[in-house]
Structure formats: structure tokens, C-alpha cells
UniProtKB/Swiss-Prot annotation:
GO terms for molecular function: orotidine-5'-phosphate decarboxylase activity. Keywords: Decarboxylase, Lyase, Pyrimidine biosynthesis. It catalyses: orotidine 5'-phosphate + H(+) = UMP + CO2. It comes from Porphyromonas gingivalis (strain ATCC 33277 / DSM 20709 / CIP 103683 / JCM 12257 / NCTC 11834 / 2561). Its EC number is 4.1.1.23. PANTHER family: OROTIDINE 5'-PHOSPHATE DECARBOXYLASE. It comes from the Bacteria. This is Orotidine 5'-phosphate decarboxylase. The active site is at 96 (proton donor). It holds the Pfam family OMPdecase.
Amino acid sequence: MTTKELFDRICRKRSFLCVGLDTDVKKIPPHLLNEDDPILAFNKAIIDATAEYCVAFKPNMAFYESMGSFGAHSFEKTIEYIRERYPDQFIIADAKRGDIGNTSDMYARSFFEHLKVDALTVSPYMGEDSISPFLSYAGKFTVLLALTSNKGSQDFQMMRDADGEYLFERVIRISQTWDNAGQLMYVVGATQASMLKDIREIVPDAFLLVPGVGAQGGSLEDVAEYGMNAHCGLLVNASRSIIYADNTEGFAAKAAGEAAAMQRQMEIALRAKGLI
């Protein structure tokens, strides 16, 4: 998939919503626990209910790895289900990988060749040679952690050098000099929306994956105001506020309602920018 194809889907669906599949077996509706694979059953219902309103799904690997091989199987089957039933959806594996070159080669092979996801979140801490194996896959995107929404982002990401440049700004700026930098996206938390204007000066054209809207309290309006570019350039993720909106047998309908409400807000933002 190209960024143009992604933008076309955003315009067609009037949405830049990414639904995060942070599925915790302890939080899903009790009636699903009788299923052979409760996690997969929950995910299928959420996917079916929200696919109309979003352009991407982002399963978070940690929630599946916590259940060992059973969870890994649920993760893989979830991706297969999206691919088969909703092939126009952009799939982001939220795994936050990143290691020396040989290890990154294996991570890239696992997610891009075996699982066939469209994008993978990656930590940039080890530098260019830890990222280049991911960028070698044409049509696949590497989503670098840049400025995250957690309180601990202040510990390192917001450190300034002698010239006043934040560490996260340096990460973004230098990564843009790497080969195949057009395949980079960046994680920027919605709770850091005040920094989006400065980030756009460094990467005016890149897509930003923005978690933190919804349960974490980030403002969709602020994100759209300061982060949207001429090709939208945003994938705003919501997880808990959608998938755990209800814990009864009507959970999927409630999730659909939450996703639809966000889609309506996104349509307003896209129209305000003249993109649709």
C-alpha cells in the first residue's frame, strides 16, 4: 500500500480512525469465555462492528503474547480475519520491535512476510542499522516511536541538546535522511498535541500514528488542527474507549456507536481542511 492509497481510503470513508485491538481476556464480556478462542471471538465481533467507520486496525502484540502460544495464535488469526474479510483495511502490528541488524531482519520477515501486516511499530533507540531491515520492504511502513503519550516521555524524549533541539525532534529529523524514509511513519501521542505544529515543520508529509484519544484524554480537535496536512497525514488510534465501551452481549453494537461518533468528528475535520 502507498500513502496515496491510504489517503484515498481516508477520503472515501471520511475517516482516519484506527481501532486498537488491545484485547485483554480479563476485560472481555463474560459470555465469550465459553468460546474455543475467546480473544478471537471478541476481535471478530469488534472488527465486524467497526470496520465501516475506520481505515486501520492496530492489534497490540503484548496483549496476545501475555497468553503464550494460545495468544500468538489468536493474534495471527485476527490478522488473517481482517485480511480476508476487510482487505482494504490498513493493519498495524503494534509490537515496538528494534534490535541489531540480524535480529531486525528476522522481525521484519516475521511481520512483513509471514503475517503480511502493512506496518509495524519500531523503537529507534539503536539507530539506522536497526531500522533499515524494516525499510527494505517496499510497500510496508515502519512506525517509529517519536513522542509518546505517557508521562515517562519527559524522561528522555523531551531532553534538549545545546542547540535547544528535543531528542524526539532529532530522532525524526535524522530518520528522514535514511534510505527509503518515505516508508516511515511516526508515533506522536494525542496528549502531546501542542507539539504537532513543530513536528509538522520537520515532517510535513509523513503520516503520524496518534494514540491517546479517548480513554487517555487526548483531543481529536487539537490533533486535527495542528497535525493534519494536505493528505490528512493522520491515523488516530482509539482502543479502550471503543472496544471496552460495554461488557454485555451488546458490546459490539456499543463499540460501533463509539467508532461511528469518532468517524463523524473526523469527517467534520476533513471537511474543514477541504480534503473531502
